[in-house]
Amino acid sequence: MSLSINAVARTQEGKGASRRLRNEGLVPAVIYGGETAPVSISFKDNELLKAVGTPGFLTGLVEVTVEGKTEQVLVKALQRHPSTGAVMHMDLQRAQADKAITTRVPLSFINAAQSEGVSKQGGRLTVESKLAEVRCLPANLPEVLTVDVIKGQLDQIFHLSDVILPEGVELVSLLKGEDHDQPIARIGKSKR
């Protein structure tokens, strides 16, 4: 499932133009990548705020419609105001159907409460990494990657190699070799 948001093309660029846009309730952004020239756009800040709060917006594919033309993009950078948290600017990268993309996907740890390490040995699951960097075609991009910890014992460490990968999806760290199989969670003693 990809999310959709509307944008408007903009002609003025630079710090002053961006400041004027923000004062009008708009957020400047740029779509770049692929075979096409970068496009400067702006979003209505209230629509963008709603979209940013939607699960998967920052880690999945987003359909952006600019003047009737729809493109699939990934959010590559999001700048926020330091005190208000308002979105100040966004960089979006085009996703081409035939070219692999690299992005971060959320990890979901399932069956922790039923694992022997938690239910019988009094342990607690501690998540060390909430995201994993993947490489795949845009059509294969998962919303979430699952790690089943049902067989977890006390003092067991779960690594990237324990992630259940859908077909056509690779973990970038594991492509570098086995010594990059970093820990992502562990079942340790509860501090009760």
From Swiss-Prot:
It holds the Pfam family Ribosomal_TL5_C. InterPro entries: Rbsml_bL25/Gln-tRNA_synth_N, Ribosomal_bL25/Gln-tRNA_synth, Ribosomal_bL25_b-dom, Ribosomal_bL25_C, Ribosomal_bL25_long, Ribosomal_bL25_short, Ribosomal_L25_dom, Ribosomal_uL5_bac-type. The keyword RNA-binding applies. Disulfide bonds: none annotated. Gene3D superfamilies: Ribosomal protein L25, beta domain, Ribosomal Protein L25, Chain P. GO terms for cellular component: cytosolic large ribosomal subunit. SUPFAM superfamilies: Ribosomal protein L25-like (SSF50715). Keywords: Ribonucleoprotein, Ribosomal protein, RNA-binding, rRNA-binding. One of its GO terms (biological process) is translation. One of its GO terms (molecular function) is 5S rRNA binding. This is one of the proteins that binds to the 5S RNA in the ribosome where it forms part of the central protuberance. Part of the 50S ribosomal subunit; part of the 5S rRNA/L5/L18/L25 subcomplex. Contacts the 5S rRNA. Binds to the 5S rRNA independently of L5 and L18. Belongs to the bacterial ribosomal protein bL25 family. CTC subfamily. NCBIfam families: bL25_bact_ctc, PRK05618.1-5, PRK05943.1. This is Large ribosomal subunit protein bL25.
